[in-house]
């Protein structure tokens, strides 16, 4: 029996210990109403008596209605809460009982009792326990390193990568590599977050002489003591040895095949690359200054548009001048030469027989004072404007007031007409610039 109690206790403890905490989002009171019902009965005299009754069952129904109202609001708000807290669960907590502003009773008139219940909308708050980092996250969080490394691999996009301490690093910043690309020095090896597989070769930092081989004619001890630089024999080197030495095993051949990257090599490479780096930065951050070309092109377009407008105005002025000026010729005040209007008049006279000076011709239908300046209708005078004549609310507007209103409306029409003409002219100019 004791084991069963312990097992049950553990079963209850485990889920409760991992349960989320709940916090309140909003609290409100929700209402339901119990309306009185008419009950008819007979008194001692046999007369019908009507009473308005509210029972305890009605109060229970009103309380359930209040809880249902709270549930409806919660269902609607849950969508909003999910957008704000996507990782939380939501619940509605209501009281077991409602608060009433009355008690079951009977009255002679219709009446009601209000039932209120408190509703608390809550959300779950997960326990803030730090999760264990994955190997990728551990690698990505490591700081950048610098230095010279061996076993460098080249990526498909041309980048250089190393496998160091179980994490992959990419060469950034200034990078210098040997001809074969297996040994590189970089000012910043940054972790990529990738964890190499167990079968991939690892990289290690390289010191002066660590990557040197035996060179030509070197011995087994050539690597750690300088390889090509000190190659040759068992104790050979640039100065030669008692058994190996010489130009072949020592300086010339051994140095060219086993030399590692040194600080001086990196410094020299950076010095040589500095001019090209500066030019590349300049080309990336600057662009050709074509402001003068754009300004010149804009000025040319403006000049062409202005010339077109000026020619059109001059042509129209010459046509009107030749029509109204009897003298014409060089003494004309409106310019010398024919206009498009003159050519149209000549064409009408030559092909259609319409003469400008002919009486009864088609010209007279529009080239006369009435056609050029048509008279505006003047109406039939002015009379007072009367509304609701003969009633208490009769309204009289005299002719003087009507004249003022007419003047104001005329001025408004003049302004609108001027604005329309101005807009039309400017739109033509804009089209000319385009």
From Swiss-Prot:
Any GO BP: entry receptor-mediated virion attachment to host cell
Organism: Enterobacteria phage I2-2
Start-end of Basic and acidic residues biased regions: 293-302
InterPro entries linked: Attachment_G3P_N, Attachment_G3P_N_sf
Protein name: Attachment protein G3P
Compartments (UniProt record): Virion; Host membrane
Annotated spans, N2: 132-200
Lineage start: Viruses, Monodnaviria, Loebvirae, Hofneiviricota, Faserviricetes
Domain free text: Consists of 3 domains (N1/D1, N2/D2, and CT), a glycine-rich repeats and a C-terminal transmembrane segment. The N2 domain interacts with the I pilus, whereas the N1 domain forms a complex with the C-terminal domain of tolA.
């Amino acid at each position: 029996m004791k084991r069963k109690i312990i097992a049950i206790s553990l079963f209850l403890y485990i889920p409760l210990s991992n349960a989320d905490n709940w916090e309140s989002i909003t609290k409100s009171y929700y209402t339901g109403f119990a309306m009185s019902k008419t009950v008819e009965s007979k008194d001692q005299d046999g007369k019908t008596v009507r009473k308005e009754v509210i029972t305890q069952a009605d109060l229970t129904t009103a309380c359930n209605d209040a809880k249902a109202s709270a549930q409806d609001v919660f269902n609607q708000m849950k969508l909003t809460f999910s957008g704000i807290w996507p990782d939380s669960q939501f619940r509605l907590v209501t009281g077991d009982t409602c608060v009433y502003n009355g008690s079951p009773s009977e009255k002679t008139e219709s009446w009601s009792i209000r039932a209120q219940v408190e509703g608390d909308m809550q959300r779950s708050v997960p326990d803030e326990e730090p999760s264990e980092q994955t190997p990728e996250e551990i690698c990505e969080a490591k700081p950048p390193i610098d230095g010279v490394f061996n076993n460098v691999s080249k990526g498909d996009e041309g980048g250089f990568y190393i496998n160091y301490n179980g994490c992959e690093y990419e060469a950034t910043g200034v990078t210098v590599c040997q001809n074969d690309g297996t040994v590189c020095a970089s000012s910043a090896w940054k972790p990529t977050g990738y964890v190499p597989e167990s079968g991939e070769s690892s990289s290690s930092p390289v010191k002066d002489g660590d990557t040197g081989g035996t060179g030509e004619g070197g011995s087994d001890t050539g690597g750690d003591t300088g390889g090509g630089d000190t190659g040759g024999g068992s104790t050979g080197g640039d100065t030669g040895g008692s058994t190996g030495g010489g130009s072949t095993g020592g300086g010339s051949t051994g140095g060219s095949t086993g030399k590692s990257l040194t600080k001086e090599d990196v410094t020299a490479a950076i010095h040589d690359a500095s001019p090209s780096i500066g030019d590349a930065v300049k080309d990336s951050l600057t662009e050709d200054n074509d402001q003068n070309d754009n300004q010149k092109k804009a000025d040319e377009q403006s000049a062409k548009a202005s010339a077109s407008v000026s020619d059109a105005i001059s042509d129209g002025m010459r046509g009107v001048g030749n029509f109204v000026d009897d003298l014409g010729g060089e003494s004309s005040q409106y310019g010398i030469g024919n206009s498009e209007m003159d050519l149209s008049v000549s064409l009408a006279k030559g092909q259609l027989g319409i003469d400008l000076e002919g009486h009864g011709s088609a010209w007279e239908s529009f080239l006369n004072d009435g056609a050029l300046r048509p008279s505006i209708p003047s109406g039939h005078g002015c009379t007072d404007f009367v509304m609701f004549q003969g009633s208490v609310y009769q309204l009289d507007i005299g002719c003087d007031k009507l004249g003022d209103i007419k003047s104001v409306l005329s001025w408004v029409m003049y302004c609108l007409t001027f604005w329309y003409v101005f807009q039309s002219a400017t739109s033509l100019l804009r089209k000319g610039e385009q």
